[in-house]
């Protein structure tokens, strides 16, 4: 069953700063939120949406932390990591 998307959101100042610092563009953020590979609750009111991507022949997990207990949802932070086995459920 596909993970539920988030289509209405705002990017917090912190998330915008971290996206710029980490080289993650708005298009990447939108694609993860619109079609996440996985979605988990971190704590009540906060979810992490993530998807696997390949950038320059290297595989990453892009993780987006979102406060879902408000409307619109707030993107708290975004990062990418090569630690697929650590973060991806049922990693190969």
Feature-to-residue mapping (PLM):
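Ribonuclease/tRNase effector modules and their secretory precursors
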Residues: 1-92
């Amino acid at each position: 069953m596909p993970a539920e998307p988030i289509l209405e959101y705002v990017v917090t100042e912190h998330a915008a700063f971290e996206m710029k610092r980490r080289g993650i563009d708005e298009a990447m953020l939108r694609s993860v939120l619109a079609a996440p590979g996985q979605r988990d609750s971190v704590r009540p009111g906060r979810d992490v949406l993530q998807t696997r991507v390949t950038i320059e022949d290297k595989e990453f997990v892009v993780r987006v932390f979102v406060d879902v207990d408000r409307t619109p949802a707030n993107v708290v932070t975004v990062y990418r990591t090569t630690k697929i086995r650590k973060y991806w459920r049922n990693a190969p």
